[in-house]
Each structure stands twice: as C-alpha cells, then as structure tokens.
UniProtKB/Swiss-Prot annotation:
Family recorded in the similarity comment: Belongs to the DTD family.
Name of the protein: D-aminoacyl-tRNA deacylase
HAMAP family: Deacylase_Dtd (MF_00518)
Alphabetized InterPro entries for the sequence: Daa-tRNA_deacyls_DTD, DTD-like_sf
GO CC annotation terms, alphabetical: cytoplasm
Assigned EC number: 3.1.1.96
Keyword tRNA-binding: yes
Compartments in which it is found: Cytoplasm
A biological-process GO annotation: D-amino acid catabolic process
Amino acid sequence: MKVVLQRSKAASVTVDGTVTGAIDSGYVLLVGITHEDTQEDVAYLAKKVANLRLWEDADGKMNHSILEQGGAILSVSQFTLYGDAKKGNRPSFTSAARPEVAEPLWEAFNQALREHGLHVETGIFGAMMDVALINDGPVTILLESK
C-alpha cells in the first residue's frame, strides 16, 4: 500500500461538477493499493498518517501531528501509484489491486483514520476526479506499508 501525503491549506475533490469532499488545513492523501495489501497494511498506514509529526512547533521544528494540529483528511483512491513505466511509454497497472479488492481496503483505511479521531472527506472510488489543493510548505511524503 502506498500513500502520497501532501500537507495542504485547503483542498477539494470534484466529480462531474459536484464537490464530493473538501477540507481546510490538513492532508491530501493519494492512496494506492496492490494485490498483497491486507488489513495490517491499512492499520499501519492509518496509524502512521495520524501520528506523523509534520506540523511546526513554536521553534519551527516539525513536532506536531495532524491530531494535535486539528487538521482534516481528504482521501483519494489512486491506482496509478502502482503504474510501472520501466518498459515502453505506456505504464502498466498490473501491480494495482483490482477494484473489488482495492475499494474495501480503501474504505477500511478511511474508517481506520476516523477511528484515530480524524475527520475524513473522500473522493469517489474509481471516478474521474478533479483534485484541487493549496500545498502547505510544500510538504509531500511518500509512505509505504512494505
């Protein structure tokens, strides 16, 4: 499982002209799921996202988590994180989990974040989405469960 985490000042996701999720300060999470991912991967990355210290303290040191900062999450499923472009010019997505496997794990990940006390907004699984965000920093971290 991979998560591209971007700290943001504001973000939203729109599907067919309708905003399906929006946050003020927090994280935008682009979430990719592969064939081998399990509930253990979900739990590991949800805990990591909740506790990662990416917010500055009074001394300017990244020392506060999103829980301490009071931010929210915008979670967007993104199978293209498992795109392989080593051969040729068209990426292969065979490492991405099939939708019937990926969607329940993405939903479980979002629920695990909520269980950590985070407010979670989402896109729509499998939809073409317009994601807008104002990067904060920018701070962008790639998290992987394996």
